[in-house]
Amino acid sequence: KEKGIENYILSGDAYPHRIPKYNDAERLQIFRENAIVGMLKEQTYTEERCTIIQEFQKAGNDADEKHVGKYSWYESYLRNGRRALENYLGTEKEINFEEVNRLVHAFKAGGEKLWVRHMGREETELWYEEKDFTGIKVLLVEWTHSNSEYYSGVDIPIYLDSTPQETLQSRLERNRDQWIDNPFTMMVLDIEQKMLKKQSEKAKLIVTRDGTVLDRKEYAQFVPKLQK
């Protein structure tokens, strides 16, 4: 905008299927249910072990890997729950990619008045705003999933490099999650971070933690492990 190019920033945070507290609950339910079902399939489940698991669940720390140190069978619970989470997070099951894609393609086709979605934290905080895009030349989509395989229409994909700890700090400041610093949230962040690192291969530009803008080749030199 400083250079005279009109733009609009669209927040992808408004496009999950569920408001934050319901999506948090869905994530936890998926983890816990599939953890138990997986144990049943592997024949590592017993009624006695279920009692132990339920105590951890009540304490809100059933995703803590430290439990494996005392109960070796607990690895089955964690592994099966995590696998189910990996199949949910950042997919069409969680995010309404179709609606985002429709908006992006409508903008690129020259649409002038488009409905933009907004989402708060409560059931009543979901609404649409008719935005006039007349004269707007650039649509910036600010989104965790901007390099997702489910998302189309991006001309210049950008990846913002960060660590799970930095993401956690950002969410603490925004008060975005329930149980923000518990083991389950850290598991979610770890899964998302690995997913984003993989998707970063699609990015044409990478912004490092100090604000430096790099292309793919420069970033590979900046982060040697990407060259492996």
Regions found by a protein language model. Give the residues of each.
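Conserved RecA-like P-loop NTPase ATPase core
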Residues: 13, 140, 203
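ATP-dependent NMP and nucleoside kinases share a basic, alpha-helical "lid"
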Residues: 67-79, 125-175
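Conserved nucleotide-sensing/catalytic segment adjacent to the nucleotide-binding pocket
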Residues: 5-124
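Glycine-rich phosphate-binding P-loop
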Residues: 1-2
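Short gly/ser/thr-rich secondary-structure transition/capping motifs
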Residues: 118-125, 138-144, 186-191
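Short, function-defining helix-loop hinge/capping sites that tune catalysis or transport
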Residues: 19-22, 150, 169, 212
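NTP-dependent small-molecule kinase module
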Residues: 156-160, 165, 169-177, 193-228
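Acidic, metal/cofactor-coordinating or nucleic-acid-engaging core segments within structured domains
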Residues: 101-104, 179-200
